[in-house]
């Protein structure tokens, strides 16, 4: 009943990033416009040497820091030289996340409960894993910020492969059935939530998710909406 990781302990140790140690990596430089869309990019093999480790405690202290304050909270003292970079990263993460929502990404506030009884189910991939929705951006959570950039890198890599006719594995999912979405929409309308419908009286999953954000019943409706979303599956893009 023990969890068996995909990588052996030796490979996991060899591939891990540690502060002050150089490590081989695949890096990407992406230029985004004001709408959060990638305009130019470059993938390359690099050597990465981390200079600091950022914790949720540090990000919480950064979020609570007063603008223009010269005082540095205790949680930020070990990374005081990187505060400016962190603020830039958070700004970029906000812009990318907003761009995802404008492009129709579905946002559900359904974090995995940190219950010991869940065992390995508590662990999810930094980018959200194999699902058709994303969680809200949490500025105090390092993995939430990292997930935004990982999704951007994944999306750019997919577009890169399509542009250059390269074989690649991509995650794809079918659209939810309109009947299932209508059931969630009816529940939202019954709670007097503002909801826009098209000429056929239906709405998209992303628009429905956005309408639920301000609702006190958001979690219950998010759970119902999640049940309408099909799990993505890997598909191989063949080179022609």
What function would you assign to each model-found segment?
Residues 1-240:
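Electropositive polyanion-binding surfaces
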């Amino acid at each position: 009943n023990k969890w068996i990781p995909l990588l052996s302990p030796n490979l996991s140790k060899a591939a891990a990033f540690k502060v002050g140690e150089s490590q081989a990596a695949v890096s990407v430089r992406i230029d985004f416009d004001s709408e959060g869309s990638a305009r130019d990019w470059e993938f390359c093999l690099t050597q990465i040497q981390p200079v600091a480790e950022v914790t949720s405690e540090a990000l919480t202290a950064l979020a609570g820091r007063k603008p223009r304050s010269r005082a540095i909270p205790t949680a930020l003292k070990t990374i005081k030289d990187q505060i400016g970079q962190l603020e830039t990263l958070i700004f970029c993460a906000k812009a990318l996340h907003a761009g995802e929502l404008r492009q129709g990404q579905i946002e559900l506030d359904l974090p995995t409960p940190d219950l010991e009884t869940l065992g390995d189910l508590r662990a999810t991939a930094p980018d959200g894993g194999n699902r058709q929705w994303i969680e809200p951006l949490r500025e105090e959570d390092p993995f939430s910020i990292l997930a935004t950039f990982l999704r951007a890198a994944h999306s750019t890599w997919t577009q890169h492969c399509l542009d250059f006719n390269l074989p690649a594995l991509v995650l794809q999912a079918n659209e939810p059935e309109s009947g299932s979405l209508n059931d969630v929409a009816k529940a939202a309308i019954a709670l007097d939530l503002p909801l826009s419908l098209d000429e056929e009286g239906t709405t998209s999953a992303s628009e429905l998710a956005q309408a639920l954000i301000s609702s006190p019943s958001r979690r219950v409706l998010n759970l119902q909406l999640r049940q309408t979303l099909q799990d993505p599956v890997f598909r191989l893009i063949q080179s022609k």
